[in-house]
């Protein structure tokens, strides 16, 4: 078999921006350091090189187009301010996809509520720090903008601390890609005809 090996490079995300700021570096400089270290580790292990190795920042148009398609298909929503202007946040609406969570065994609301009752019968579900032991939600994923806490970011409005060159203008506001859309857009670009 002829294998097409795509190894995408996430060169823009919250962690890269935060680590770069803490180190006094440009975000793209920090991303390149991580990419180089990863490639060296792969080479040390003798792993075959990829057929394609796209960087997320080189595929912004692909990501924006895919987000538009997701919104047009009723699976995403743009957050707007009180005047109806887009804020830059776009989320995937998990409730719009009936099979969402099947692969990872996550439950939709009604089933999750029933599971919560069972968990409550098992004892306290919240630990001393206030974290839900049975259904943890990353605090970074919590937002009043979301319809459901499980909705995930397709596009993120910039934080005040984000550098100006880490922001892209889109029909849904200025921001940068969410982590999941990067992989999806690049996979579609390089593997759609496979």
Predicted ranges, named:
Residues 1-194:
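NTP-dependent nucleotidyl-transfer catalytic core
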């Amino acid at each position: 078999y002829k294998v097409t090996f795509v190894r995408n490079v996430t060169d823009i995300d919250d962690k890269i921006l935060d680590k770069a700021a803490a180190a006094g570096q440009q975000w793209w400089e920090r991303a390149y350091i991580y990419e180089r270290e990863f490639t060296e580790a792969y080479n040390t292990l003798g792993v075959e090189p990829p057929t394609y190795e796209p960087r997320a920042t080189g595929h912004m148009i692909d990501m924006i187009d895919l987000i538009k398609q997701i919104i047009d298909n009723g699976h995403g929503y743009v957050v707007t301010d009180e005047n109806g202007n887009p804020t830059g946040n776009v989320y995937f609406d998990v409730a719009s996809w009936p099979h969402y969570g099947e692969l990872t065994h996550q439950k939709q609301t009604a089933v999750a509520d029933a599971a919560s009752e069972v968990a409550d019968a098992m004892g306290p579900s919240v630990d001393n720090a206030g974290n839900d032991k049975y259904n943890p939600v990353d605090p970074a994923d919590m937002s009043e903008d979301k319809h459901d806490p499980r909705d995930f970011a397709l596009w993120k409005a910039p934080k005040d601390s984000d550098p100006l060159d880490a922001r892209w203008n889109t029909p849904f506001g200025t921001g940068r890609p969410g982590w999941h859309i990067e992989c999806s857009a690049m996979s579609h670009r390089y593997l759609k005809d496979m």
